[in-house]
Amino acid sequence: MQGKKPGGSSGGGRSGELQGDEAQRNKKKKKKVSCFSNIKIFLVSECALMLAQGTVGAYLVSVLTTLERRFNLQSADVGVIASSFEIGNLALILFVSYFGARGHRPRLIGCGGIVMALGALLSALPEFLTHQYKYEAGEIRWGAEGRDVCATNGSSSDEGPDPDLICRNRTATNMMYLLLIGAQVLLGIGATPVQPLGVSYIDDHVRRKDSSLYIGILFTMLVFGPACGFILGSFCTKIYVDAVFIDTSNLDITPDDPRWIGAWWGGFLLCGALLFFSSLLMFGFPQSLPPHSDPGMESEQAMLPEREYERPKPSNGVLRHPLEPDSSASCFQQLRVIPKVTKHLLSNPVFTCIVLAACMEIAVVAGFAAFLGKYLEQQFNLTTSSANQLLGMTAIPCACLGIFLGGLLVKKLSLSALGAIRMAMLVNLVSTACYVSFLFLGCDTGPVAGVTVRYGNNSARGSALDPYSPCNNNCECQTDSFTPVCGADGITYLSACFAGCNSTNLTGCACLTTVPPENASVVPGKCPSPGCQEAFLTFLCVMCVCSLIGAMAQTPSVIILIRTVSPELKSYALGVLFLLLRLLGFIPPPLIFGAGIDSTCLFWSTFCGEQGACVLYDNVVYRYLYVSIAIALKSFAFILYTTTWQCLRKNYKRYIKNHEGGLSTSEFFASTLTLDNLGRDPVPAHQTHRTKFIYNLEDHEWCENMESVL
């Protein structure tokens, strides 16, 4: 006994020393773990970056008309600026998504954010490289109080600058225009890695059942960005464009004056700063987060085997993926694989259908929402600022809430692939019904002198309509601008000049022949339509419901997509998704909606002898065509959702689900399905408290294409 004590004591001492050393090493490891090893911190950083991205994109839209007036641009030029972002994004998205999955994703995202910040700063640069704005040269014919009135006997023929000079300036090549295009291309290039790499990074480091919630939060912030962008645009355009260079107290115009140009450049500087600082956070995250980096995750994972989170995910649960990039291959060889990988993804009917369905859903948003402000102005006689303010405070926040609720429902209900696609189908049907109701919510154009009715309120059609009448022939009225006025006779006139008003107080209007001369006056704005206010309130409520419900389909669609490809192709699959979203969902729809809206025009403005913008629409035809295009796209999306559901459903042999939710990918392939036990009975009953199903593979390609059907 005594002989053993020294040995035992020595052994115990060595054991204690080893345990002490191990404890010290563990303490050092714990001390080395930083906040950047937490996926939730990455989520916050990614949300900040996507919020800034959404803000700068919407801000550009909010100041497009300001840019048009500031740099004498035409509408086609402004359209090119708006589409330059997508061009820059399309140029690199496939390459970044493919090679980025093998690189340091957080750093690539951070680099993209810095490039976006540079693009935002360059967007503001034209204001500092050009001359100061001279609003006296901004208009050709305006009265002393900024109103277009009848000018008889050439009383204002010598007012203002030479019209020919203004026309030449407006059509001249503008280097600032090219700089704006280059800045937007940079913004598009910088945005390339943010979404696909960010989504795949989050999905790789959270539990399967939590992935939908995290991704839902991510896209909620992306959609919330436009609300911030519109609000920022409303604020900046109320500040004079050269406020930092001149004393604004000497200005004799206000933001309500059509000659006013706001400080459009200020928002780009603010967005650039936000993009830069949110990008810096990305450089602190590791290439791959350590397991159990979140202390609160262990208790949540207790119901699942711990080994699921300690070992790497299999490529497809059966074999190494044949298209997995080989790190030893040269860059040229890897580039040659990209077409094969793309073909491989598109040969998966589930992947293809869900991507096309997402494109149709985004097409509705990109087309319908792009002209929604204009639609509210035309249908319900709202001002531009009021329309943008309502959109920023109602429809966009509801869409944000819908995306978040969609991700939350997928998580709480533990929806499988079939459950998620059923949810998308149901959401699509309800939102389509909301769009159908829009067909009946609107206002008529009303009587407009010389356009829908003759002067004197006599109905007429076709060639009998002419805005020029004997009562205003000598007024030299121009159609380069649209400043409608409502006459005491209840008829809308294109301007006070077309109403024959010879005074800036809008009295003595010769064309109001149905009222006594002393009452022949007009007030600014269109004449109100009966019942329009009630229709607008109903439209606003239905729009909120439609935005809320329609947005709930986004997260289930993304979840289905990333579950139908192998993990090593996840980032590239998301890149293909965002590529097709831009090719099919963002670029064509505004052109289609815009062409359809232009076809309903009743009266076009003219500038410098050329056709300008439409100033008056047939509201009924406008409403039917505008809403019908959206309904057609939503219906096509429903057909694609149904096809996806059929592709999944016909390949199930058995689907059994209990109360505890989803079976992880590794558990599914490791415990219930391999190439050796295909056709055999599933794992015995000791595998309880899990979602179980046997997936009836039609061929080996389905095994490679479908990582899981959770």
From Swiss-Prot:
**Glycosylation site list:** N153, N169, N381, N457, N502, N505, N519
Q: Which residues lie on this side of the membrane: Cytoplasmic?
A: 1-40, 101-106, 204-222, 287-344, 411-414, 563-571, 649-705
Q: Which GO terms describe its molecular function?
A: oligopeptide transmembrane transporter activity; organic anion transmembrane transporter activity; prostaglandin transmembrane transporter activity
Cysteine pairs bridged by disulfides in the record:
C471-C497, C475-C486, C477-C501
Region span, Disordered: 1-25
Identify the Gene3D superfamilies for this entry: MFS general substrate transporter like domains
- What task does this protein carry out? Putative organic anion antiporter with apparent broad substrate specificity. Recognizes various substrates including thyroid hormone L-thyroxine, prostanoids such as prostaglandin E1 and E2, bile acids such as taurocholate, glycolate and glycochenodeoxycholate and peptide hormones such as L-arginine vasopressin, likely operating in a tissue-specific manner. The transport mechanism, its electrogenicity and potential tissue-specific counterions remain to be elucidated.
| Topological domains, Extracellular | 61-79, 132-174, 244-261, 367-386, 439-539, 598-630
Q: State the Gene Ontology BP annotations.
A: monoatomic ion transport; oligopeptide transport; organic anion transport; positive regulation of canonical NF-kappaB signal transduction; positive regulation of MAPK cascade
Q: Does the keyword Membrane apply?
A: yes
Question: Where N-acetylmethionine occurs along the chain?
Answer: M1
Report keywords, A-Z. Answer: Acetylation, Cell membrane, Disulfide bond, Glycoprotein, Ion transport, Membrane, Transmembrane, Transmembrane helix, Transport
- Give a GO cellular-component term: basolateral plasma membrane
User: Where's it found, cell-wise?
Assistant: Basolateral cell membrane; Apical cell membrane; Basal cell membrane
Q: Which InterPro entries match?
A: Kazal_dom, Kazal_dom_sf, MFS_trans_sf, OATP
Q: What is this protein called?
A: Solute carrier organic anion transporter family member 3A1
Membrane topology per the record? Answer: Multi-pass membrane protein
Which parts of the sequence belong to the Kazal-like domain? 465-513
The annotated regions of Gly residues compositional bias extend over: 1-15
Q: Which SUPFAM superfamilies match?
A: Kazal-type serine protease inhibitors (SSF100895), MFS general substrate transporter (SSF103473)
Gene disruption: observed consequences = In a cholestasis model, mutant mice show decreased survival rate associated with excessive accumulation of bile acids in liver.
The keyword Nuclease is annotated on this UniProt entry: no
Q: What induces it?
A: By androgens in kidney and lung.
Transmembrane residue ranges? 41-60, 80-100, 107-131, 175-203, 223-243, 262-286, 345-366, 387-410, 415-438, 540-562, 572-597, 631-648
Q: Which family does it belong to?
A: Belongs to the organo anion transporter (TC 2.A.60) family.
Top-level taxon in the UniProt lineage: Eukaryota
